[in-house]
Amino acid sequence: MAASDKSVDDSLYPIAVLIDELKNEDVQLRLNSIKKLSTIALALGEERTRSELIPFLTETIYDEDEVLLALADQLGNFTSLVGGPEFAMYLIPPLESLATVEETVVRDKAVESLRTVAAEHSAQDLEIHVVPTLQRLVSGDWFTSRTSACGLFSVCYPRVTQPVKAELRANFRKLCQDETPMVRRAAANKLGEFAKVVETEYLKSDLIPNFVQLAQDDQDSVRLLAVEACVSIAQLLPQDDVEHLVLPTLRQCASDSSWRVRYMVAEKFVDLQKAVGPEITRVDLVPAFQYLLKDAEAEVRAAVATKVKDFCANLDKVNQVQIILSSILPYVRDLVSDPNPHVKSALASVIMGLSPMLGAYQTVEQLLPLFLIQLKDECPEVRLNIISNLDCVNDVIGIQQLSQSLLPAIVELAEDSKWRVRLAIIEYMPALAGQLGQEFFDQKLRGLCMGWLNDHVYAIREAATLNMKKLVEQFGAPWAEQAIIPMILVMSRNKNYLHRMTCLFCLNVLAEVCGTDITTKLLLPTVLLLAADPVANVRFNVAKTLQKISPFLEASVIDAQVKPTLDKLNTDTDVDVKHFAAQAIAGIAAA
């Protein structure tokens, strides 16, 4: 008897512990217990999970949002733990309850789990258990339940009978007309996915009137979500129907009084273009695109500017060049000198992509003048976006033409009297070098990079040093050995001590990317020579450099060449030299 009692106690243990933990004052403990629900369910078995655990969770969970969110997430994966699809209906009550709470993230997760569980029901069980849940949510007093209802239509509709389908369409219409904006917003958000499962006949008779109504809502937050639905609906209809049923509303959205709605149209423009096809694009979308490119709101212009390349790429190939030249480029020219830097930057990130579409002649005639303006723009992002995408143009017109047209502008910027402009070009140089290739770089740009090392502004010299490291990473150590290290080593003999210091700074960073052989053979001898420099600043930088490059030297080299030099510097007459020498000796010993 005692053994029998013990087995009963053991079987009750998981649920008892769960109850205790869920009543604990510590939120973290409650959260952990929810995350272990599947383990507890396995211990209880399917029947007791259905008869004890699920009712307990349904009745007693009123907790912090974090705990409720974890519960909503767990229950979505619980079907197998309650006995499989034929018992999935047991999960509906707790999830329905969670779908009505105040916190949006909890509701959204509950709806996500409800959708998962609903899909696991048989068609018959769906009508018996899930559809009534949906209808209760639709007629709930609080807007929270009605917003959650919107997410369930598309999973229920395809598998129910015709009379129930009619009810669901009527319920959805009711939500589209709800007095609360949050509910209408949720309906607009789910309209597109619902449209995908509704028969074409009812899409036209029921859902498109809902779409038109939502697109005219007095709240712009509802109208902008209707724009997303527009894409889905346009994809589902034949061209004639799109023209008559969707386009009037789309035109209205493109010229909406709220910039947020127009912004959404701009964001979705290429998706809309793909949905409506080339003929409607040519007749209707090109004018709408032009309208948005001239929008009064900079946010809208920036959004549509980022779509210029993709919109043009998806134009009908027969008319593509003609449409770009006559209908798009005149507006793009205006954006090149837009007063807003975000708009100019957005355009600069895509404009080079027009080059392959227009071909060599039109690129030279039409696009290069715009690129030159953008290369000289005061906004660094604009210049960077042009330089970063030069490969598109290079592929079309070739390096020769590109260098003749754009290189003078780059050189001009590299030698600009404003040091910040010079700095910007230095920062773009690795990207530029990568696009133009090593041979071109050596011919046209290497001299510029070396010149920056001798700039009178320290920030430029510092940036130029880091630039050298990035170039070696790009082109490799053998290139560095041939192309730049000899020129840098010459600086160690310059009469101006600042040049000798820059030489040391370069050797510091080059050791990291050139490896042991080059560091030992080429870099170290020059550093050691500068240990006898007459200027104390150079000598203490030798000490710092020796410490910095020591990880890239063999131990025997450190013992034979580095340590004797540092010992000598440690007896220097200058206090700073002695300090940094001692620091280097200690640093190398500790390594």
UniProtKB/Swiss-Prot annotation:
InterPro entries per record: ARM-like (IPR011989), ARM-type_fold (IPR016024), HEAT (IPR000357), HEAT_type_2 (IPR021133), PP2A/SF3B1-like_HEAT (IPR054573), PP2A_Regulatory_Subunit_A (IPR051023)
GO MF annotation, one: protein phosphatase regulator activity
Location, primary (coarse class): nucleus
Subcellular location: Nucleus
HEAT repeats (start-end): 10-48, 49-86, 87-125, 126-163, 164-202, 203-241, 242-280, 281-323, 324-362, 363-401, 402-440, 441-479, 480-518, 519-557, 558-591
GO CC entries: centriole; chromatin; cytoplasm; cytosol; FAR/SIN/STRIPAK complex; INTAC complex; nucleoplasm; nucleus
Tissue expression per record: Expression varies in tissues throughout development. Highly distributed expression in early embryos. In late embryonal development, found at high levels in nervous system and gonads. In third instar larvae, found in brain, imaginal disks and salivary glands.
Transmembrane parts of this sequence: none
Keywords: Acetylation, Nucleus, Repeat
GO process terms (BP): centriole replication; centrosome cycle; chromosome segregation; meiotic sister chromatid cohesion, centromeric; negative regulation of hippo signaling; negative regulation of insulin receptor signaling pathway; negative regulation of smoothened signaling pathway; positive regulation of macroautophagy
Residues bearing PTM N-acetylalanine: A2
Family from the record: Belongs to the phosphatase 2A regulatory subunit A family.
Function field: The PR65 subunit of protein phosphatase 2A serves as a scaffolding molecule to coordinate the assembly of the catalytic subunit and a variable regulatory B subunit. Key mediator of a quality checkpoint during transcription elongation as part of the Integrator-PP2A (INTAC) complex.
Subunit annotation: PP2A exists in several trimeric forms, all of which consist of a core composed of a catalytic subunit associated with a 65 kDa regulatory subunit (PR65) (subunit A). The core complex associates with a third, variable subunit (subunit B), which confers distinct properties to the holoenzyme. Interacts with the inorganic phosphate transporter PXo (CG10483). Component of the Integrator-PP2A (INTAC) complex, composed of the Integrator core complex and protein phosphatase 2A subunits mts/PP2A and Pp2A-29B.
Domain notes: Each HEAT repeat appears to consist of two alpha helices joined by a hydrophilic region, the intrarepeat loop. The repeat units may be arranged laterally to form a rod-like structure.
Protein name from the UniProt record: Serine/threonine-protein phosphatase PP2A 65 kDa regulatory subunit
Organism of origin: Drosophila melanogaster
Lineage: Eukaryota, Metazoa, Ecdysozoa, Arthropoda, Hexapoda
